[in-house]
A protein has these predicted regions:
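Conserved glycine-rich Rossmann-like NAD(P)H-binding loop of the short-chain dehydrogenase/reductase
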Residues: 38-52
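Active-site helix of classical SDR
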Residues: 130, 166, 174
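Substrate-binding pocket helix/loop in short-chain dehydrogenase/reductase
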Residues: 106-107, 111-119, 214
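Residue(s) in the substrate-gating loop at a strand-loop-helix junction
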Residues: 150
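Short C-terminal tail/terminal secondary-structure segment
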Residues: 2-7, 155, 234, 245-262
Length: 262
């Protein structure tokens, strides 16, 4: 898996926490950081999926990551989990805010409670995770936060208003906290994935016609997979990117440009 991936010496033994690590992009992030020799911890919404990711890491010859199920919408429980990770593994030096869901919803069907839930699931926990880990990160000499965004809001994707609003907010959060935390040597950047092929997307939303639409809209005629997202995430986590903060890096094969030129 890692044969064509750069090795970053600064990530060896570094404590990394990834939310939403039980499947899709998150699972690939867990495997990729473990292959760098990092000390990885992650959470998923339920106990399902997490143990299989741990087993895949061990089978590849790397140290077993630490996993706990957690609903990131429960801020108190989530911050308590982050505290336990810090006590067990040491100060979290890399935080990857990844958990979220792009459930489709027509505007007419959205209730106030559903809207609040979408924001809670796709944005709110990012802030409170950073709030929880920043003191320890700063005391350890600094660190890196990577927020996972989405190109969907840049393209104005329909039937996703709660999701796209939250994902647009991630850019504002990233830039504000990059300014606020820079004096503590904490960098805050965002990765903005495009049409990534994951198990969930394939099961719910992808078919040959949809795949072709994405390819037609992309500058690069390739199928993006979680590895395309993991590789630049490793770079932003490593000391090699220590001059970068407040940035959003698109990993979308150029699909965002389609909304500009069409």
């Amino acid at each position: 898996m890692m044969s064509n991936t750069t090795i970053y010496p600064s990530l060896k033994d570094r404590v990394v926490f990834i939310s939403g690590g039980s499947s899709g992009i998150g699972a690939e992030l867990v495997r990729s950081f473990a292959a760098q020799g990092a000390r990885v911890a992650f959470c998923g919404l339920s106990a399902d999926g997490g143990p299989a990711v741990v087993e895949s890491v061990v089978a590849a010859g790397h140290a077993a990551p630490y996993f706990e199920p957690c609903d990131v919408r429960d801020v108190a429980a989530y911050q308590a989990l982050l505290g336990r990770v810090g006590e067990k593994l040491g100060a979290i030096r890399v935080l990857v805010n990844n958990a979220g869901r792009d459930d489709r919803h027509a505007m007419e069907d959205v209730t106030s409670a559903y809207w609040d839930d979408r924001i809670s699931l796709n944005l709110k926990h990012y802030f409170f995770a950073i709030q929880a880990v920043a003191p320890g990160m700063a005391a350890a000499g600094g660190g890196s936060v990577i927020n996972m965004g989405s190109v969907s809001w840049m393209r104005g994707r329909p039937n996703l208003a709660g999701y796209t609003t939250a994902k647009a907010g991630i850019l504002g959060l990233t830039r504000t906290l990059a300014r606020e935390l820079g004096a503590r040597n904490i960098r805050v950047n965002a990765i903005v994935p495009g049409a990534i092929v994951t198990e969930r997307q394939t099961a719910l939303h992808r078919d040959p016609a949809a795949d072709q639409q994405f390819l037609d809209a992309q500058c690069l005629k390739i199928r993006l997979d979680p590895g395309h997202v993991a590789r630049p995430t490793l770079f932003l986590a490593a000391d090699d990117s220590d001059g970068m903060t407040g940035q959003h890096v698109l990993v979308d094969a150029g699909i965002a440009q389609q909304s500009v030129i069409s």
